[in-house]
Amino acid sequence: MNIVEGKLSAEGLKFGIVVGRFNSFITERLLEGAIDCILRHGGSKENIEIVKVPGSFEIPLTAKKLAKSGKYDAVICLGAVIRGSTPHFDYVANEVTKGIAQVSLETEVPIGYGILTTDTIEQAVERAGTKMGNKGFDAAMVAIEMANVLKSIG
């Protein structure tokens, strides 16, 4: 029996990171977490390309472009969608999530999903480096591991 598991080493891996600027007080912290994760796991700043887009809705298209370029071992998507008083939150959160999943399946490039979908600003802050950890860091961990899993599979 052969068991394939991804190692948590970013050494030599190239990452594209897409970050939504909307709610930048949250997304910048997610970005810091993702970069910190890559560097702590042996990656280098030279192998990270960051693309900033207006908001979370623009992330899937940009992620697809990065993934299809063939330059990256993984793409990390970072954004924050915070519920307001209209149904806009539901539409954006659903479509962004579906779009990112579709990109990964179509391109066979691993995607680290770091889109916060929270009911309150406080919940977003908690997930961007305070009480609940940093979901940008977590998304980068997934990207590192999955890039290595797919390399192992061939």
From Swiss-Prot:
Catalysed reactions, semicolon-separated: (2S)-2-hydroxy-3-oxobutyl phosphate + 5-amino-6-(D-ribitylamino)uracil = 6,7-dimethyl-8-(1-D-ribityl)lumazine + phosphate + 2 H2O + H(+)
Metabolic or biological pathway, per its Swiss-Prot or TrEMBL entry: Cofactor biosynthesis; riboflavin biosynthesis; riboflavin from 2-hydroxy-3-oxobutyl phosphate and 5-amino-6-(D-ribitylamino)uracil: step 1/2
Enzyme class (EC, first level): transferase
A GO cellular component annotation in the UniProt record: cytosol
Pfam families xref list: DMRL_synthase (PF00885)
The UniProt record lists the keyword Nucleus: no
Function description: Catalyzes the formation of 6,7-dimethyl-8-ribityllumazine by condensation of 5-amino-6-(D-ribitylamino)uracil with 3,4-dihydroxy-2-butanone 4-phosphate. This is the penultimate step in the biosynthesis of riboflavin.
HAMAP family per UniProt: Lumazine_synth
Protein name: 6,7-dimethyl-8-ribityllumazine synthase
Species assigned in the record: Sulfurihydrogenibium sp. (strain YO3AOP1)
